[in-house]
Amino acid sequence: ALAGNLCRCTGYRPIVEAIKKIDGDIHLPECSKWSKCMNSKSETASFFYPVSVEEAYELSYKNDNTFYLSGGTDLNLSEISPSIKPNYILLNRIPSLNKIHEKNNEIHIGASVTLEDTLPYFEKFFPPFAEIIRRFGSSQIRSQATIAGNLCTASPIGDTAPSLMALGASVEIFS
């Protein structure tokens, strides 16, 4: 189901037109969900899907112009010079970064945990912050966007940083 605002001018027309442009069936390579064959390259960008933090490190050292992504909801907002071919390292297939858990009265949130998945924890420990998360974009955005991404984009309109600062949150960064 779709939620949020839909443009009154175009409605579903662009979505329907895009689907109609698909000619025939789409065949994906036969490989497991976590297989390296999921890596893809085009003339304008490369996408890598590591399955471990170590593999992500390795990819970042082997490739220039690397950018880490998980939800990727702000990808179209970023401005990358046309002369640069970005190498995106997608972190959302790394199991350890998709975990959220409570430990010693703290919430530990992996870089690929979606905003939607944080809600039960914030509702339990910080209900006002849960309310902020519920107002964050549409349900589609919350199901894709991550707190890590919201912090890493350093957007002046980032919704999570002020609350996390007030809560005394800390961030563990690897590079």
Can you describe what each PLM-predicted range is?
Residues 1-175:
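C-terminal structural segment of proteins
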